[in-house]
Amino acid sequence: MTIKAISVDIDGTITYPDRRLHEKALEAIRLAESLGVPVMLVTGNTVQFGEAAAILIGTSGPVVGEDGGALSIKEGKLRKRVYLTNMDEEWILWGELKKRYPEALLSFSMPERKAGLVVLRTVPVKAVRELIKELGLNLIAVDSGFAIHIKKPWINKGTGIEKACEYLGISPKEVAHIGDGENDLDAFGVVGYRVAVAQAPESLKEKADYVTTKPYGEGGAEAIEHILRKFGYLPEEKT
């Protein structure tokens, strides 16, 4: 197996628990880039957030935002945004959800979003899923650990990575993905190598080829270095 790119979740994977970027993860990402391995930031957050992070961190790969619904492709000094869907039934769900649960709140990032709703965790994800079923909507609700992402069933990190790979000219099987949440499962389904960070749910760890010993950003750094060593970009550590 050959790995030509690394895709990595942001929140909880290359950050501290409070979402500050972890220094060790930053160093590891820049090490990968210096070795010719493009890093793709893959997030449930907005594509604009991902773009800003990519610029500050220094990643060269595409940005996958909105859980796979939006991409940002680097073209020279400019970036092109690609949206894989739009919202319709999502707003029907939101109207009914707000009626039944007045405490329901949308993410402050909604004005920038085009591919799905993000509801804060003031409402149980189970209640959202039950309402989707009751209304007969073709939507799913995924708990990222930070918020509830409501979207079309075919919009996920896996489809976003597949689209990003078209622009890179590589197969998704030549990508190693690192994540820490339920919304990373679809990414695990399309890539060639899978790493779960230590605090990830068991559902993700069960599908991983490697689980880090350290959590959060320190675990993200461990994951990147593990991938670089396993696939020959760095020498194996002596035991």
Swiss-Prot record:
<comment type="function">
    <text>Catalyzes the dephosphorylation of 2-phosphoglycolate.</text>
</comment>
<keyword id="KW-0378">Hydrolase</keyword>
<dbReference type="InterPro" id="IPR006382">
    <property type="entry name" value="PGPase"/>
</dbReference>
<dbReference type="Pfam" id="PF08282">
    <property type="entry name" value="Hydrolase_3"/>
</dbReference>
<dbReference type="GO" id="GO:0016791">
    <property type="term" value="F:phosphatase activity"/>
</dbReference>
<protein>
    <recommendedName>
        <fullName>Phosphoglycolate phosphatase</fullName>
        <ecNumber>3.1.3.18</ecNumber>
    </recommendedName>
</protein>
<keyword id="KW-0460">Magnesium</keyword>
<dbReference type="GO" id="GO:0008967">
    <property type="term" value="F:phosphoglycolate phosphatase activity"/>
</dbReference>
<dbReference type="InterPro" id="IPR036412">
    <property type="entry name" value="HAD-like_sf"/>
</dbReference>
<dbReference type="InterPro" id="IPR023214">
    <property type="entry name" value="HAD_sf"/>
</dbReference>
<feature type="binding site">
    <location>
        <position position="9"/>
    </location>
    <ligand>
        <name>Mg(2+)</name>
    </ligand>
</feature>
<feature type="binding site">
    <location>
        <position position="11"/>
    </location>
    <ligand>
        <name>Mg(2+)</name>
    </ligand>
</feature>
<feature type="binding site">
    <location>
        <position position="180"/>
    </location>
    <ligand>
        <name>Mg(2+)</name>
    </ligand>
</feature>
<feature type="binding site">
    <location>
        <position position="184"/>
    </location>
    <ligand>
        <name>Mg(2+)</name>
    </ligand>
</feature>
<dbReference type="GO" id="GO:0005829">
    <property type="term" value="C:cytosol"/>
</dbReference>
<keyword id="KW-0479">Metal-binding</keyword>
<keyword id="KW-0119">Carbohydrate metabolism</keyword>
<feature type="active site" description="Nucleophile">
    <location>
        <position position="9"/>
    </location>
</feature>
<feature type="binding site">
    <location>
        <position position="157"/>
    </location>
    <ligand>
        <name>substrate</name>
    </ligand>
</feature>
<comment type="similarity">
    <text>Belongs to the archaeal SPP-like hydrolase family.</text>
</comment>
<dbReference type="GO" id="GO:0000287">
    <property type="term" value="F:magnesium ion binding"/>
</dbReference>
